[in-house]
Amino acid sequence: MHPRFQTAFAQLADNLQSALEPILADKYFPALLTGEQVSSLKSATGLDEDALAFALLPLAAACALTPLSNFNVGAIARGVSGTWYFGANMEFIGATMQQTVHAEQSAISHAWLSGEKALAAITVNYTPCGHCRQFMNELNSGLDLRIHLPGREAHALRDYLPDAFGPKDLEIKTLLMDEQDHGYALTGDALSQAAIAAANRSHMPYSKSPSGVALECKDGRIFSGSYAENAAFNPTLPPLQGALILLNLKGYDYPDIQRAVLAEKADAPLIQWDATSATLKALGCHSIDRVLLA
């Protein structure tokens, strides 16, 4: 079991501990539960889906990296496939506040970058901030997304974001988590190709500035993040953050990164290079390359 889970695990009910122990035994537990695993946990504990998700939130929050706030938020995004995806907030010493990741963004990106097609619900241990409510409104599940909070009745996103402004107001038809392929040729080594493939999946209907980041760890594992724009612009998630979300949730740490590649267009209206390289250097990665999409 990864050390970060030990304290939260010890506080779980005995029957949930017994059912989870073989799942969490792998140090690189992928911070997700398949539909089959969810069904097994429900049977072992007698909990329904909502109660089980609440019970698992401490494990999601244990994935948080919060050197600034020391305020850990956990989220579980429930995919329509039946898979549940953990998420947690992330803060980066030496970078800017704008580079931080919210738990809801983490869980949603985890699902999206894992190939999930849509979300049915999201469970969070604290009320989503306005930033996250706006981020969620970019999803193809839209204002119908169910939000579950401890001690409250579940409500749709529309109840948390009345009179919402979103992609439909800008006549955007392709939404976040819809399948997209921008068709750039995969060239270069494996890491470069991973970055280009991530750029091909970008959701960037507002700027038309595709980008993707791929991180290579010392053991050869590669994590890729795609750019995810938002109708309100500021809640946009950069591609580096997508890759860092996966790196963290899959049990790796910043010192494990040995090389990074950013893929973007040289003449795009928005350029990720400066922010990406500055944040990576703050995290200790200095081997950073840029591949131009063509």
Curated annotation (Swiss-Prot):
Cofactor: binding comment: Binds 1 zinc ion.
Residue ranges of domain CMP/dCMP-type deaminase in the record: 48-168, 186-294
Keyword Nuclease found: no
Binding positions for Zn(2+) per the UniProt entry: 102, 129, 132
Keywords annotated in UniProt: Hydrolase, Metal-binding, Zinc
Domain of life: Bacteria
Top EC class for this record: hydrolase
Binding partners and assembly: Homodimer.
Protein name (database record): Cytidine deaminase
